[in-house]
Amino acid sequence: MKNKLIERLISYAKVDTQSNENSQTTPSTPGQLALANMLVEELKEIGMKDVTIDENGYVMATLPSNTEKEVPTIGFLAHVDTATDFTGKNVNPQVIEQYDGKDIVLNESLNVVLSPKEFPELADYAGHTLITTDGTTLLGADNKAGISEIMTAMEYLIAHPEIKHGKIRVAFTPDEEIGRGPHKFDVEAFNAKFAYTVDGGPLGELQYESFNAAAAKITCKGTNVHPGTAKGKMVNAAKIAMQFHAALPENEAPEFTEGYEGFYHLLSIKGDVSETSLSYIIRDFDRDRFNERKDTVQKIANNLKAKYGENSVTVDMNDQYYNMREKIEPVKEIVDIAYKAMKNLDIEPVVKPIRGGTDGSQLSYMGLPCPNIFTGGENFHGKYEYISADNMVKAANVIVEIVKLFEERA
């Protein structure tokens, strides 16, 4: 199983599937469709049924039930795209057998080193087979490891018909990294009662709480006049933008928060004297505090408008997704089953909130309750990304164990 997982991850990683938030198509990039079509062929090859791909690149497939029992249909999902934070072009994965616990030179010429001094958890992987980058791209284990694990678990179940299970649905989706993963996902066609995204990080992660999330674009407009004759006339949009940001609570930013703490995150600032725009994301686990944060943004804008004029500041704010806990709590047994599956395999479940979102955040509000389980990866979205192949085996085994437990409980 381990070699199969490594082969799959490497072959998927080599397809550039970075999504693009400025594109209006679905999927947002052609590489995602290329990988989706590869996955369709592979699903057919391993013996999955009802394999489909729609015009938006959503792949679905079925493993039919092999039990007499009435078992609820469950699904497993992963996304094909990689993050916009770092290049996913020409990914060249490195396989390190029997990792010795020391520095890993990812790229000698560029002096890129993956070191336990910088990443202390790396030392815990001594003895593991690791898959790393070559120091010039991300790896794409987020979420191609999830795809590999789902595919390998399905192949295992097909090869072992003595393992009884209900109907299983599988889906591979585009554009998760730009928040659009579920936008064109056909929940009705998928037709599962519950599902799991296989999109978590280190071994044992089990998540059913996500942020409430909004995006805000603040546009500040000024009046540009020759600086030599600007007294009493110039209004500097860049300075209005600086005042806006300075009015937000300084310590409520990603670099100062953890656990259940929310934040305002300035993604980008662009502009000049005439016009400057600020792009933020707003995050909180608690719905009331989330709404308070959005109110704070609006109040600061209103104060600046009072000072500089009605058209000086505009706020364009929209909600992106909500904390899936609200939709999963009523069917908490799906979390309990995943918890028990890990325990059965001597994996210590690490139940913690996702300081982010998954496709499951939105799908849970679309009628498909969808917690998240680990892939085994670390340091997603950058050149220091790596994954333990040994823990990928454990993730695939957890999928198999979840399926068994649903059948046993029926």
Swiss-Prot record:
Q: Name one GO biological process term.
A: proteolysis
Catalysed reactions, semicolon-separated: Release of the N-terminal residue from a tripeptide
Residue positions binding Zn(2+) 1: 79, 142, 199
Cofactor, how bound (note): Binds 2 Zn(2+) ions per subunit.
Keyword annotations from UniProtKB, A to Z: Aminopeptidase, Cytoplasm, Hydrolase, Metal-binding, Metalloprotease, Protease, Zinc
- Catalytic activity, EC: 3.4.11.4
Q: Which GO terms describe its cellular component?
A: cytosol
Protein source organism: Bacillus licheniformis (strain ATCC 14580 / DSM 13 / JCM 2505 / CCUG 7422 / NBRC 12200 / NCIMB 9375 / NCTC 10341 / NRRL NRS-1264 / Gibson 46)
- Could you tell me which cysteines form disulfide bridges? none
This chain belongs to the protein called: Peptidase T
EC class: hydrolase
The UniProt annotation places Zn(2+) 2 binding at 142, 177, 381
Q: Where is the active site?
A: 81, 176
Which cofactors is this protein said to need?
Zn(2+)
Q: Which gene encodes it?
A: pepT
Q: Which residues form a coiled coil?
A: none
What HAMAP family has UniProt attached to this entry?
Answer: Aminopeptidase_M20
**What are the recorded GO MF terms, alphabetically?**
metallopeptidase activity; tripeptide aminopeptidase activity; zinc ion binding
- What NCBIfam families does the annotation carry? peptidase-T, PRK05469.1, PRK13381.1
Mind telling me which PROSITE patterns this protein's record contains?
Answer: ARGE_DAPE_CPG2_1 (PS00758), ARGE_DAPE_CPG2_2 (PS00759)
